[in-house]
Amino acid sequence: MCGIAGQISADPNKIAANYPAYCRMQKSLARRGPDQRGIYLHGHAALIHARLAVVDLENGCQPMVLDQGGEKYILVYNGELYNTPELHAQLAALGHRFVSHSDTEVLLHAFAQWGPDCLEKLN
């Protein structure tokens, strides 16, 4: 099971100042996800992920970022989508372009396309 941590702060200076703490958090999650680790800092948020790779070992790195239509979407995720191929096909037909075969990327594109309503489409 992957490890996920993070912080949201009203003061963006606290996010930047806490970077050493995020590195320690990430290190403490290493046993949860030995395959890849990542930290994403932006404005008022910090996202930390330690990945236990199951699908797409090379390209499913997290936190995963998607820039689409002038919007930026960032996701840390632990789980498994059982209908990844179907959702991938639907999203590709709508013009989404993928760089991996990970369910994380499919989930990220699904949210970009349908917003919170994407949850109704997940299996």
Question: What are these model-predicted stretches?
Answer:
Residues 1-123:
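N-terminus-centric sequence/structural signature that marks the extreme N-terminus
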